[in-house]
Amino acid sequence: MSAPGGPLARLEARLTREWQRRGALAWALTPFACVFGLCAALRRTAYAQGWKQPMDVGVPVVVVGNVTVGGTGKTPTVIALVDALRAAGFTPGVVSRGYGANVKAPTAVTPASRAGAAGDEPLLIARRTGAPVWVCPDRVAAAQALRAAHPDVDVIVSDDGLQHYRLARTVELVVFDHRLGGNGFLLPAGPLREPLSRHRDATLVNDPYSGALPPWPDTYALALTPGAAWHLDQPALRRPLSQFAHERVLAAAGIGAPERFFATLRAAGLAPATRALPDHYAFADNPFVDDAFDAILITEKDAVKLGASWRDARLWVVPVEAALDPRLIALVVEKLRGRSPA
């Protein structure tokens, strides 16, 4: 993992900027985007035409993913969806790739797992929901292992995996942030893994700036709301964000879209200094040791990577709750109760 402000971080930042416009670099990369698009289309076609068969794991599957590169708010969406499905009478489990973890075989994730062995998002989901969570690059194998260990699970939520066509799914939810499809180009000329026209059952858009929705069918607003911050060393100690308004505050985030976290804090009335760390930043050491701030606000996803050896009394964790549209929940429940995996 690159250091904060290192070459990889600068490259990521430049690509993110370039992917929002159709500049010279984007046009120069379009031949490679055409090749990427052809390969992706062949994979989709292989499953759509029956040349390859998706694997039915015996229970309905809801995939929460995206067609763009980078963070869009999938993890809080998965957490909220698990809670909503449980409230509707289901017993959900979660599968994930376990990005960043050294996982080769299906592995159970518990609240006591380490982020390095489980992945930061799966660990956060396990801690927030209490649902069974299994990780493996082969999501079919993860789902099969989860069902064998938890036969009472009657629906599986896949954290990401929209392009993992081998896993049969009943519902596909695609999450966007305010950037939507950027410049509209496929990788590497743009941020798209698949065309914006790709079929899905519903689209969720998290736009903390305008709140506007694109004119796409079955599109719902996704609201991410911060809760009271809790102290990293003393989780029972909580403070409303408003209490940080008159302190010297640094907001730091090692997530796919750190600016979204910063915007959330600004919307809560704070004016923090900000530091964007590389996505999945490992926190091998304390990058804040030389910073003169009264408080440092970090994300839950970053907090799961900070073990007991961290002793920085300035660190506060800001939880984020996703509010799902009741109509979206009703749509998902209806599809789960009325259709088998396909």
Swiss-Prot record:
The entry's protein name is Tetraacyldisaccharide 4'-kinase
| Reactions this protein catalyses | a lipid A disaccharide + ATP = a lipid IVA + ADP + H(+)
Listed under GO cellular component are: plasma membrane
Q: Which InterPro entries match?
A: LpxK, P-loop_NTPase
Q: Annotated pathway, please?
A: Glycolipid biosynthesis; lipid IV(A) biosynthesis; lipid IV(A) from (3R)-3-hydroxytetradecanoyl-[acyl-carrier-protein] and UDP-N-acetyl-alpha-D-glucosamine: step 6/6
Q: Which GO terms describe its biological process?
A: lipid A biosynthetic process; lipopolysaccharide core region biosynthetic process
Sequence positions that bind ATP: 68-75
Q: In the UniProt record, does the keyword Glycoprotein occur? A: no
Please name the gene that encodes this protein: lpxK
Q: Which family does it belong to?
A: Belongs to the LpxK family.
Function of the molecule: Transfers the gamma-phosphate of ATP to the 4'-position of a tetraacyldisaccharide 1-phosphate intermediate (termed DS-1-P) to form tetraacyldisaccharide 1,4'-bis-phosphate (lipid IVA).
Keywords of the record, alphabetical order, are: ATP-binding, Kinase, Lipid A biosynthesis, Lipid biosynthesis, Lipid metabolism, Nucleotide-binding, Transferase
Cross-referenced Pfam families? LpxK
Q: Can the keyword Metal-binding be found in this entry's annotation?
A: no
Q: Which organism is it from?
A: Burkholderia orbicola (strain MC0-3)
What EC identifiers does the entry list? 2.7.1.130
Q: Which GO terms describe its molecular function?
A: ATP binding; tetraacyldisaccharide 4'-kinase activity
